[in-house]
């Protein structure tokens, strides 16, 4: 009897959660908008965290587009994140493949990925050593300032 009660409770909770998820949208925040612009400031030294950040950015882009609002995103990566973007680095191959896959998914959506040249120099990384689809810029702080001045919302991700 106790097991049956647990199963029923779990089923009800699951059904309730799926109905809540279907009802959620961003209509209030996005009302009256036809487009949005954001620059994501990414700083992490952990590859799984970077993958989570890339996934959140991808999903946010998709959700925005599904609500008929065009999204223009820039992902600005600096600091120790740069070391995670190097093609021929030591580490778990499967983890690196997932990172590359997420980079490709972001690129396919037209999301601009930038690597800080200041950090490249600091860590001794050449721009050509980065994964494909990542643009090297002089200094990501200038990108953050410039894009905000152009009306892009700053989204810290670390």
Predicted regions and their residues:
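N-terminal secretory signal peptides
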Residues: 21-74
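Short acidic/glycine-rich loop or secondary-structure boundary segments that cap or lie
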Residues: 48-50, 83-86
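Active-site-proximal beta-strand/loop segments in catalytic clefts of secreted hydrolases
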Residues: 42-44, 76-80, 116-119, 157-158
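Bacterial N-terminal signal peptides
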Residues: 5-16
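A cross-taxonomic marker for long C-terminal extensions/tails that follow the last structured domain
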Residues: 86-158
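Acidic helix-start/capping segments at beta-turn-to-alpha-helix junctions
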Residues: 71-85
């Amino acid at each position: 009897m106790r097991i049956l009660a647990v199963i029923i409770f779990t089923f009800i909770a699951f059904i309730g959660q799926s109905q809540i998820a279907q009802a959620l949208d961003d209509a209030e925040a996005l009302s009256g908008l036809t487009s949005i612009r954001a620059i994501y400031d990414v700083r992490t030294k952990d590859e799984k965290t970077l993958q989570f950040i890339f996934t959140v950015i991808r999903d946010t882009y998709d959700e925005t587009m599904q609500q008929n609002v065009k999204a223009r995103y820039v992902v600005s990566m600096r600091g120790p994140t740069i070391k995670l973007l190097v093609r021929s680095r030591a580490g778990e191959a499967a983890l690196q493949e997932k990172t590359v896959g997420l980079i490709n998914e972001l690129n396919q959506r037209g999301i601009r990925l930038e690597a800080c040249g200041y950090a490249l120099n600091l860590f001794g990384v050449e721009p050509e050593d980065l994964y494909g689809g990542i643009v090297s810029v002089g200094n990501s702080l200038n990108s953050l300032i410039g894009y905000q001045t152009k009306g892009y919302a700053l989204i810290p991700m670390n």
